[in-house]
Every structure is written in structure tokens, then in C-alpha cells.
Amino acid sequence: MPKSRTCSFCGGSIEPGTGLMYVLRNGQILWFCSSKCYKNFVKLRRKPDKLEWVRKVKKSLLD
């Protein structure tokens, strides 16, 4: 059975067979649920705690 993964940026769940895997130079693997999360984290270097939409996603996951 495929593993369920969580997004490294927003914390959302990633369905098996979808998402984006990004490997850092130190060997750490980051998983992203969408290109929006990938671009915000890797290219724009934004912190997830400072974005309102990320807080809403994390709050909805906890409820």
C-alpha cells in the first residue's frame, strides 16, 4: 500500500501518485502538494507561518 504524505509547506495531505518531490543538497526530501506550495517555499523562500492561507489550511486539518 502506498504511503500517504504531507506537504512540507502547508501540511496538507498528498494522494499517492500526485505531488512534487524536491531533494535538497543535504539529502533531505521535501514533498509539496501543489506548484503553489513549491514556488512559495523553494523559489520565493517564504515562511509558511507568515502566510494567512497556510494558517487556514492547517486549522482546517486540525478540525
Curated annotation (Swiss-Prot):
It comes from the Archaea. InterPro entries: L24e/L24_sf, Ribosomal_eL24, Ribosomal_eL24-rel_arc, Ribosomal_eL24-rel_N, TRASH_dom. Keywords: Metal-binding, Ribonucleoprotein, Ribosomal protein, RNA-binding, rRNA-binding, Zinc, Zinc-finger. A zinc finger (C4-type) spans 7-37. Binds 1 zinc ion per subunit. Gene3D superfamilies: Ribosomal protein L24e. Its cofactor is Zn(2+). GO terms for biological process: translation. One of its GO terms (molecular function) is structural constituent of ribosome. Zn(2+) binds at C7, C10, C33, C37. Binds to the 23S rRNA. Part of the 50S ribosomal subunit. Forms a cluster with proteins L3 and L14. NCBIfam families: PRK14891.1-1. This is Large ribosomal subunit protein eL24. It comes from Aeropyrum pernix (strain ATCC 700893 / DSM 11879 / JCM 9820 / NBRC 100138 / K1). The gene is rpl24e.
